[in-house]
């Protein structure tokens, strides 16, 4: 509900989105996914994750992702518990041999670099930074064996294309695809570790990480393990690989997370795969950005159209329109999670446009914002 200082405005039902969830993660979960938890997936709850029924569910996730991303020969889907946050530490222990290079342009791309800088077994990373709303050009350095950036910076709505930098040679390209995977175009052959969590484009719950790994990445994991480098078992990539190839996780996974994820993957593949998903997010984002450019009180925060994300849109408001008040009124009317990333501190709304979000609902959201602003 809105607080006492927020005007009480009741948005007409006729212009509201059919579904008012626009959060950037956790994100909208489709009703059809939820229904499987009490139907086809119900028998899996409370059963061993080392037995065939749950292992088959993990296998369904792995094979579905292999189809969705058209994996080249030798690439494997690896998974483990803990979310992308855990994978940052796992990668610091298990993918970086000596030194890494990081592009940072927001909260989440910076967090991987921070995790690496604290790891005692690798050298101080090279960190190339740009201001929020922009991004550095992917590049390499002869001293590094990992090059890392985010496909989509969730905090700012900046998307950076995934291509191996020229001259990267044997350096692994490690991409944080947490809010990009499944909604942005990618050629997996341009990456060595394309990792993500399932609570964004894949409309599931958090607490799980998945990484699509190349033969080079798998070889690197083996080579580092052979040196005897210490790593906690929970963060051990060799253990994660060994278990994943058996369609299981090192420790007990959340069945609901896997079931929701599997349903969403099947839905994406069944509708036309990644090409279909990318066209859908492109449609949604075109509606949002066109609206923002046409209004006198809004503008896209990301000024370079080539960097604007199709899956997370950030829209700045002029000073005399308080975006925070707009977000509170929207929330009081059942249109939720349009607030900006808390640490960015801008007068803006942030809108997720993952595949589960209907493009028509994005249009309805913009109509609701217009209705609210006209009455402030």
UniProtKB/Swiss-Prot annotation:
It is found in: Cytoplasm. Pathway: Amino-acid biosynthesis; L-serine biosynthesis; L-serine from 3-phospho-D-glycerate: step 2/3; Cofactor biosynthesis; pyridoxine 5'-phosphate biosynthesis; pyridoxine 5'-phosphate from D-erythrose 4-phosphate: step 3/5. It holds the Pfam family Aminotran_5. It catalyses: O-phospho-L-serine + 2-oxoglutarate = 3-phosphooxypyruvate + L-glutamate; 4-(phosphooxy)-L-threonine + 2-oxoglutarate = (R)-3-hydroxy-2-oxo-4-phosphooxybutanoate + L-glutamate. Keywords: Acetylation, Amino-acid biosynthesis, Aminotransferase, Cytoplasm, Pyridoxal phosphate, Pyridoxine biosynthesis, Serine biosynthesis, Transferase. L-glutamate binds at residue 50. The modification N6-(pyridoxal phosphate)lysine is found at residue 200. Pyridoxal 5'-phosphate binds at residues 84-85, 108, 154, 176, 199, 251-252. GO terms for biological process: glycine biosynthetic process, by transamination of glyoxylate; L-serine biosynthetic process; pyridoxine biosynthetic process. Its cofactor is pyridoxal 5'-phosphate. Binds 1 pyridoxal phosphate per subunit. GO terms for molecular function: alanine-glyoxylate transaminase activity; L-serine-pyruvate transaminase activity; O-phospho-L-serine:2-oxoglutarate aminotransferase activity; pyridoxal phosphate binding. Its EC number is 2.6.1.52. The modification N-acetylalanine is found at residue 2. Gene3D superfamilies: Aspartate Aminotransferase, domain 1, Type I PLP-dependent aspartate aminotransferase-like (Major domain). GO terms for cellular component: cytoplasm; extracellular region; plasma membrane. InterPro entries: Aminotrans_V_dom, Pser_aminoTfrase, Pser_aminoTfrase_mycobac, PyrdxlP-dep_Trfase, PyrdxlP-dep_Trfase_major, PyrdxlP-dep_Trfase_small. It is an enzyme of class 2 (transferase). Coiled coil: none annotated. Homodimer. Belongs to the class-V pyridoxal-phosphate-dependent aminotransferase family. SerC subfamily. Catalyzes the reversible conversion of 3-phosphohydroxypyruvate to phosphoserine and of 3-hydroxy-2-oxo-4-phosphonooxybutanoate to phosphohydroxythreonine. This is Phosphoserine aminotransferase. It comes from Mycobacterium tuberculosis (strain ATCC 25618 / H37Rv). The gene is serC.
């Amino acid at each position: 509900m809105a607080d006492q200082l927020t005007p009480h405005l009741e948005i007409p039902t006729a212009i509201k989105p059919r579904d008012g969830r626009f959060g950037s993660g956790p994100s909208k979960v489709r009703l059809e996914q939820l229904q499987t938890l009490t139907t086809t997936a119900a028998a899996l709850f409370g059963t061993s994750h080392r037995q065939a029924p749950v292992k088959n569910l993990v296998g369904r996730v792995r094979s579905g992702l292999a189809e969705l991303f058209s994996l080249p020969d030798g690439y494997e889907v690896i998974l483990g518990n803990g979310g992308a946050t855990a994978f940052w530490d796992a990668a610091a222990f298990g993918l970086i041999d000596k030194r890494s290079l990081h592009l940072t342009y927001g909260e989440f791309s910076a967090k991987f670099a921070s995790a690496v800088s604290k790891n005692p077994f690798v050298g101080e990373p090279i960190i190339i930074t740009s201001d929020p709303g922009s991004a550095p050009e992917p590049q390499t350095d002869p001293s590094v064996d990992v090059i890392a950036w985010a496909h989509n910076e969730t905090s700012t709505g900046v998307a950076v294309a995934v291509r191996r930098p020229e001259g990267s040679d044997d350096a692994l390209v490690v991409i944080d695809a947490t809010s990009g995977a499944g909604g942005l175009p990618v050629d997996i052959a341009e990456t060595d570790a394309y990792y993500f969590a399932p609570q964004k484009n894949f409309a599931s719950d958090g607490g799980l990480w998945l990484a699509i790994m190349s033969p080079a990445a798998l070889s690197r994991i083996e080579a580092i393990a052979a040196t005897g480098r210490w790593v906690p078992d929970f963060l051990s990539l060799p253990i994660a690989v060994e278990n994943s190839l058996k369609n299981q996780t090192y420790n007990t996974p959340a069945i609901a997370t896997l079931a929701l994820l599997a349903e969403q993957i099947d839905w994406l593949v069944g509708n036309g795969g990644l090409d279909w998903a990318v066209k859908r997010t492109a449609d949604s984002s075109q509606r949002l950005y066109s609206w923002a450019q046409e209004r006198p009180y809004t503008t896209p925060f990301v000024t370079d159209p080539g960097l604007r994300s199709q899956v997370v849109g950030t829209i700045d408001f002029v000073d005399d329109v308080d975006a925070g008040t707009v977000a509170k009124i929207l929330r009081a009317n059942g249109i939720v999670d349009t607030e900006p990333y808390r640490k960015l501190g801008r007068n803006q709304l942030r809108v997720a446009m993952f595949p589960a979000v209907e493009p028509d609902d994005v249009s309805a959201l913009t109509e609701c914002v217009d209705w609210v602003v006209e009455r402030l």
